[in-house]
């Protein structure tokens, strides 16, 4: 069942909005380019989340049962320069400036509107300011219920907000990025994807300007960061497993995941089996051909070359709501519509603030298990010791 089609509980977010989306029925005006004056001015956002809205969501995660004790022997990340894959990197100590960019898009007025994404952005805002030491004036929020054009998550606004987030970043800074909205995939053109597809997110004006692809987001928010600067990214969208193109993805056992070339043939394998059972030789050969093509594409990607290209000496960590081939759920909990991954992250971190990277991933998986098919992912710009303390 798709959002807006009736009951609204535990349904999957579609991969992308359908043709014909035009916001509130009239579309968004495009005369926004000159409002920036060549730069992204922080003072535009200082008062955007004040007064009665702030604190609206406080308290809803505080009285829930805790997880087990923090992992024994857990230590903070070291401050010294590390070696990984023949290159140097450095963990952030989180002692510098804190900045955050939060994006929530409900696609208001569209046939595939979502209901929980704007709530997700506000809930993350509340979590960051209440528990993590982020100041409201250092947080930019883009949502499609805003009246000011500069605060609407148009593609150009999102790009400039990303540039603002990483501008003048220094070692030990703590940057946070959150996106809740539609996600999807498009054909990979530069050969850096093992499944042959780039992951994308959809701004409200995607029909006129296109989606925002993972390569672009990587170039803006990962490549530009200096050694020792931290970016924590949280994506609550479909097909978001590698949406920042980070080269190291970790399993719940704490090891780097290697792709199973045959694991994601999925529907082609089912179609081949059905064709064989019914004696449809034409369909059988077609399905087998698609399976071989899929596997060949993955084998043609030089994994080590990609890791070298996508490696960053900065400290970039991404938590995503689903694998590249999965959708993410939009649901209802605690009296409001929310995204399952955003809600799980806040719940897990408020119940047990002391987490290792590994325990955080495991607890996120456990939080969603039984309710949703999606499996949260943990990836990084460099090799990480998953037993270190997760700090942000």
Swiss-Prot record:
Single Gene Ontology MF annotation: calcium-dependent cysteine-type endopeptidase activity
Residue numbers annotated as active site: 182, 238
InterPro entries assigned to the protein according to its UniProt record, in alphabetical order: Caspase-like_dom_sf (IPR029030), Metacaspase (IPR050452), Pept_C14_caspase (IPR011600)
Bias type Polar residues, positions: 1-14, 53-63
Enzyme Commission number(s): 3.4.22.-
One GO term describing the cellular component: cytosol
Region Disordered, annotated ranges: 1-87
Compositional bias of kind Low complexity: 41-51
Superkingdom of origin organism: Eukaryota
GO biological process, one term: protein quality control for misfolded or incompletely synthesized proteins
Membrane-spanning parts: none
Family: Belongs to the peptidase C14B family.
Function: Involved in cell death (apoptosis).
Name of this protein: Metacaspase-1
